[in-house]
Every structure is written in structure tokens, then in C-alpha cells.
């Protein structure tokens, strides 16, 4: 376990989308999205995960995206003195492939890895424990578990997460998207204070952080980074990853922001992520509304809903 008394990964991290143009990765648009996140004060970035449509990317595309992200973050850190970790999605349902991914990304600027509970295979709790232990032993970088049973078909139980947090030094956090609040509360109560429990669902971030979670890996922040940073900081997250915590949460402000943002949170999941948030970014003129099959652009109803909620938040001219 991390021997510090504060978690390493805290606040708001954006699960970055991957823009496409005419079927190819739009690296220029991606670069602008990264810059926009940094200027909004985002605490950390998460490229090449679910929201980035990573299963549909070629290895050379993944590498170019990471290198672009790293170069822009390095330049920002040099100019501002503010550290913004880059957490790279590397997980698969094969131990060997996950290790190959980590080896592939490690020399190119990954500060940590987000590793999903293996999908399709439906491993037991013992299998999950042994898998993540082996993953962590294969790298010297921090590893964050990603528990999202709605996509993987396998749920990591609280007891398994707690064992990993206690037994494996560089497993430093979990992105929890099970939607099982009693399980999440058990994790928060059972892991060391140095372990990051991060919401994987924007809509329950306030509930999780009020119960002691460290922050969120957000989809919504792709489109509304300034408001998400403000919201998470009002909940009492550190203003910068690894910095001192704010003195006290501003409960009135966080509640006001939650109810203001909640329609957008809901809109981001009326269709499979990242379909709606890509529609939002396209409406804002930041990307082309393209995805790679088997994902397709949103329905007209979803686009109209996004136009409505973004307009109310002041993000459309």
C-alpha cells in the first residue's frame, strides 16, 4: 500500500474521448481537448480508456495519442509548476496482453495505469485477486483498478478490493462504477487512507465523496471541465492532485452545482458512453461527431437533449 496518509489520485480526472475525422484519429482536435482540460484546472487525465474507444484503436494510434497528451502536459507543467498525472488505460481480459500494454506505454509518459476487471472471462474473486496482483508485480508504476460490472460481466467485491489495497504496494486506487453503494461504502471503510476510491459515475460522485471517496474519473468533464473542477473542489477534493485538502467542503455550493449539473450527467448516459458526450463536444464545435463501429452517432432525440442541457449550462453560443 501507499505509505503516505493521503491518496495519490484525487479530485477530478477526465476520461478523454478520442476524436475522429473521416475515419481517422483527429490528433489536432485531441491536442486542443487536452489543452482545454489543463486550462480548466483538471487534476489528472485518463486517455485510452472506455470513453476513448480504446478497443477500436490501433497500437500506433494509441501511442501517438499518449505522446501528444504527454507533450502537452509536460509543457503545461513547465509553464505553471502544477503537476497533472496521466493515467493510461491498459487493461484487457488477458494478463499477458495487459502486461504488454503497460510495457508499451511505460516509456512514453504514463504516470499510472487504469486496469479494468477482466471482461467476458467472468473470473472468480480469487481469479481477480491473482490477476491484479500479477499486473501490479509486472510494473513499477501505480495501478488503479476499474470495476464496471455493467460492461465486464464481473463485479469485484469489496473484500477483494480491500485485500489488494492492503497486500499490493502499487495498487493505489479503484475507479468504482458498480452502482452498488453499500459495496462502495464497505470499500471506503476498509481500505487504507492512502488508497484512492474514485467514482466511475458522475451522478453519484457527490454521494461517494460525502462518504469519503477521493474524487471521480469523469465523462461529463470532457464537455464541462470548468464546472466539474468547481464541483469536485466544492466537495472537498484537493485543488491539485497530491496537494493539501481544502479546509472544509462547501456543502451548499456542491449541492447547488450537483442539481445544476445533474441533467447533463443523465444526458451523458442516455445512450452508450461515449456516444452522448461526443455529440455534446460536436455541438460545441470541438470535434466531429464521429465514432468507430460498432458505435454510431447518437439519435436526433439525444442530440436535441444535449443541445438543451448544454444551452442551460451556458456552453452553447
Per-range role (PLM):
Residues 147-148, 170-171, 292-293:
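Glycine-rich phosphate-binding "P-loop"
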Residues 94, 201-202, 299:
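Helix N-cap/beta->alpha junction signal
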Residues 72-83, 108-109, 139-141, 167-170, ...:
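Short helix-capping segments at alpha-helix termini
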Residues 30, 62, 66, 98, ...:
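A general structural signal for well-ordered alpha-helical segments in protein cores
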Residues 2-14, 18-153, 163:
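Active-site beta->alpha loop and helix N-cap motifs at the rims of alpha/beta catalytic domains
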Residues 137-138, 151-269:
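Catalytic alpha/beta core domains of metabolic enzymes, predominantly
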Residues 8-19, 36, 40-42, 51, ...:
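C-terminal alpha-helical cap/extension of soluble enzyme domains
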Amino acid at each position: 500500500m501507499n505509505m503516505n496518509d493521503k491518496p495519490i489520485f484525487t479530485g477530478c480526472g477526465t476520461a478523454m474521448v478520442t476524436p475522429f475525422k473521416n475515419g481517422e484519429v483527429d490528433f489536432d482536435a485531441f491536442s486542443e481537448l487536452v489543452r482545454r482540460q489543463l486550462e480548466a484546472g483538471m487534476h489528472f487525465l485518463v486517455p485510452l480508456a472506455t470513453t476513448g474507444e480504446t478497443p477500436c484503436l490501433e497500437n500506433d494510434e494509441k501511442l501517438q495519442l499518449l505522446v501528444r497528451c504527454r507533450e502537452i502536459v509536460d509543457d503545461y507543467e513547465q509553464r505553471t509548476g502544477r503537476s497533472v498525472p496521466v493515467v493510461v488505460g491498459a487493461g484487457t481480459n488477458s494478463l499477458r496482453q495487459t502486461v504488454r500494454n503497460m510495457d508499451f506505454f511505460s516509456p512514453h509518459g504514463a504516470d499510472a495505469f487504469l486496469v479494468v476487471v477482466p471482461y467476458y472471462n467472468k473470473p472468480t474473486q480469487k481469479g481477480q485477486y491473482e490477476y491484479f496482483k500479477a499486473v501490479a508485480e509486472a510494473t513499477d508504476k501505480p495501478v488503479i483498478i476499474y470495476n464496471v460490472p455493467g460492461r465486464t460481466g464481473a463485479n469485484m467485491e469489496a473484500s477483494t478490493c480491500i485485500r489488494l489495497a492492503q497486500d499490493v504496494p502499487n495498487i493505489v486506487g479503484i475507479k468504482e462504477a458498480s452502482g452498488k453503494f453499500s459495496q462502495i461504502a464497505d470499500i471506503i471503510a476498509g481500505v487504507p487512507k492512502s488508497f484512492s476510491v474514485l467514482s466511475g459515475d458522475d451522478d453519484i460522485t457527490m454521494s461517494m465523496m460525502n462518504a469519503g471517496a477521493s474524487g471521480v474519473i469523469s465523462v461529463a468533464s470532457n464537455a464541462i471541465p470548468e464546472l466539474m473542477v468547481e464541483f469536485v473542489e466544492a466537495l472537498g477534493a484537493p485543488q491539485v492532485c497530491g496537494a493539501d485538502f481544502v479546509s472544509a467542503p462547501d456543502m451548499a455550493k456542491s449541492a447547488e452545482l450537483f442539481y445544476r449539473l445533474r441533467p447533463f450527467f443523465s444526458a451523458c448516459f442516455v445512450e452508450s458512453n461515449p456516444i452522448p458526450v461526443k455529440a455534446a463536444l460536436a455541438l460545441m464545435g470541438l470535434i466531429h461527431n464521429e465514432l468507430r463501429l460498432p458505435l454510431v452517432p447518437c439519435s436526433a432525440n439525444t442530440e436535441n437533449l444535449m443541445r438543451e442541457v448544454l444551452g442551460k449550462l451556458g456552453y452553447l453560443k
